[in-house]
Swiss-Prot record:
Membrane topology designation: Multi-pass membrane protein
GO molecular function: membrane insertase activity
GO BP of this protein: protein insertion into membrane; protein transport
Full protein name: Membrane protein insertase YidC
Assembly and interaction partners: Interacts with the Sec translocase complex via SecD. Specifically interacts with transmembrane segments of nascent integral membrane proteins during membrane integration.
Classification of source organism: Bacteria, Pseudomonadati, Pseudomonadota, Gammaproteobacteria, Enterobacterales
Gene, per the UniProt record: yidC
Organism: Cronobacter sakazakii (strain ATCC BAA-894)
Biased segments, Polar residues type: 111-127
Subcellular localization: Cell inner membrane
Low complexity bias locations: 30-52
Length: 550
């Protein structure tokens, strides 16, 4: 296999990967968008087995820290809206990114409460969700204040007192949700806590920020973690098909994911909880947990607690909230390579202070580490090229005798100490690293709206002037012209001729950070080719004159 065939293999693998990604994203039929009023009225019946009721109408209170702005409904205490104040909706916009939303066309809420036999959120105990009382309608984290606490109180008809407390800290996206239950009666109370995330499956146009069909589609859907299964995705269409999750675990978490952002309920690690998914009807899916019952004796008080993550997928901060929560960053099936690569990229950024220059630096590092494989690949291909005259003579001599041809070719390879797969094996090792870098650059929120230099103001967006994709195509064309070839098939020659153009078209819609990586990688390839060819010339395995005549 010569270097141009090698390039063709990479191209075919790449295109096949893109087609597979697009098919995975688009193969499921999409449900119709429904009205929020329909979804809320059906939630109670659909999740009846969990004892989780629907939301109702109550007063909306606002909670604001330096990084979060939450809207909480006093009817049940659900979070119906979450704005991420440090992340603009679009580059240059003063409007913050909205993660949780409750509108006629789309619902994405973080619900929580107390259910079980005597829980106030059990639809059998009340006419609806408990209506909590608060001291104020607005809570704002003041300057010099590090924590904001929002107590909400409710007393049922039997006189039992329930306090639901939200606690938010400065600079944090983890929200503490605690419950104090005081039994004022003469009989024990049986209480379970729950946390549920529900979302409309089909995205309205204003929230559909997915990549183009030529680029990677990051995962959007549910996920969970237990001590036995540290990270499992759960597709929305799986929930819609009623193939629902139903596992018990001590510790773990449940989440809903999208590119760059996530919400997750983390129950107390010392309590066994049931993790579930549910189709709430009308195109709304839910994932949640329900804790094991707690007995509250007469005159006694019990405490229950959980944590809600609502924010960007910042790996080190998520790892502090719960084990394996950092795995929600969608690095695909090569996460075990992408994660250390991102840690290296972040370490480089701590010195350079620019994500674009950090991408350039990590490209040099990765290609430097892979240089021995690249050298072995080029050496093997050079040896194979030198054997081509002997192989051609062998074909002419043996004709259609394939068995003898195979035997003599293997004997020739053995005599010349050439591995026919030597050009492929290094490529097979490099491809996972190549794809892991691809996932890493596409899935890291740190690159969202991150500027580089000159006209590149957002490394997560496409080049507005298409300069980088054209430069990438030019470097690919130059590599192709530099590379020796023994390709004689006219069809392969045509494919190779148009491959830089095809790749340039593909990369027009790719994030500029990813295109930058490919440009630098191609430039490194050009440098490494020159070094390797000079060494091969000294060994008599390569001739520049032959390349010029070819």
């Amino acid at each position: 296999m010569d270097s141009q065939r090698n390039l063709l293999v990479i191209a075919l693998l790449f295109v096949s990967f893109m087609i597979w990604q697009t098919w995975e994203q688009d193969k499921a039929p999409k449900p119709q968008v429904q009205q929020t009023t329909q979804t809320t009225t059906t939630a109670a019946g659909s999740a009846a087995s969990q004892g989780v009721p629907a939301s109702g109408q109550g007063k909306l209170i606002t909670v604001k820290t330096d990084v979060l702005s939450l809207t909480i409904n006093t009817r049940g205490g659900d979070i119906e809206q979450a704005l991420l104040l440090a992340y603009p909706k679009e580059l240059g916009s003063s409007e913050p990114f909205q993660l949780l939303e409750t509108t006629p066309n789309f619902v994405y809420q973080a619900q929580s409460g107390l259910t079980g036999r005597n829980g106030p959120d059990n639809p059998n105990n009340n006419k609806g969700r408990p209506l909590y009382n608060t001291e104020r309608d607005t809570y704002v984290l003041a300057d010099g204040q590090d924590e904001l606490v929002i107590p909400m109180t409710f007393t049922d008809e039997a006189g039992n007192a329930f306090t639901k407390t939200f606690a938010l800290k400065r600079g944090q996206y983890a929200v503490y949700v605690g419950y104090d239950v005081k039994n004022a009666g003469t009989q024990p109370l049986e209480i379970s806590s729950f946390g549920q995330l529900k979302q409309t499956i089909d995205l309205p146009s204003h929230r559909d920020t997915g990549s183009s069909n030529f680029a990677l589609h990051t995962f959007r859907g549910a996920a969970y973690s237990t001590p036995d299964e540290k990270y499992e995705k759960y597709k929305f269409d799986t929930i819609a098909d009623d193939e629902n999750l139903n596992v018990n675990a001590k510790g773990g978490w449940v989440a809903m994911l999208q590119q760059y952002f996530a919400t997750a309920w983390v129950p107390a690690s010392n309590v066994t909880s049931n993790f579930y998914t549910a189709d709430l009807g009308h195109g709304v899916a839910a994932i949640g947990y329900k804790s094991e019952p707690v007995q509250v004796q007469p005159g006694q008080t019990a405490k229950l607690a959980s944590t809600l993550w609502v924010g960007p997928e910042i790996q080190d901060k998520m790892a502090q909230v719960a084990p394996h929560l950092d795995l929600t960053v969608d690095y695909g099936w090569l996460w075990f390579i992408s994660q250390p690569l991102f840690k290296l990229l972040k370490w480089i950024h701590s010195f350079l202070g620019n994500w674009g220059f950090s991408i350039i630096a990590i490209t040099f590092i990765v290609r430097g580490v892979m240089y021995p494989l690249t050298k072995a690949q080029y050496t093997s291909m050079a040896k194979m090229r030198l054997l081509q005259p002997k192989i051609q003579a062998m074909r002419e001599r043996l004709g259609d005798d394939k068995q003898r041809m195979s035997q003599e070719m293997m004997a020739l390879y053995k005599a010349e100490k050439v591995n026919p797969l030597g050009g492929c094996f290094p490529l097979l090792i490099q491809m996972p690293i190549f794809l892991a870098l691809y996932y890493m650059l596409m899935g890291s929120v740190e690159l969202r709206h991150a500027p580089f230099a000159l006209w590149i103001h957002d490394l997560s967006a496409q080049d507005p002037y298409y300069i980088l994709p054209i430069l990438m195509g030019a470097t690919m064309f130059f590599i192709q012209k530099m590379s020796p070839t023994t390709v004689t098939d006219p069809m392969q020659q045509k494919i190779m001729t148009f491959m830089p153009v095809i790749f340039t078209v593909f990369f027009l819609w790719f994030p500029s950070g990813l295109v930058l990586y490919y440009i630098v990688s191609n430039l490194v390839t050009i440098l490494q080719q020159q070094l390797i060819y000079r060494g091969l010339e000294k060994r008599g395995l390569h001739s520049r004159e032959k390349k010029k005549k070819a």
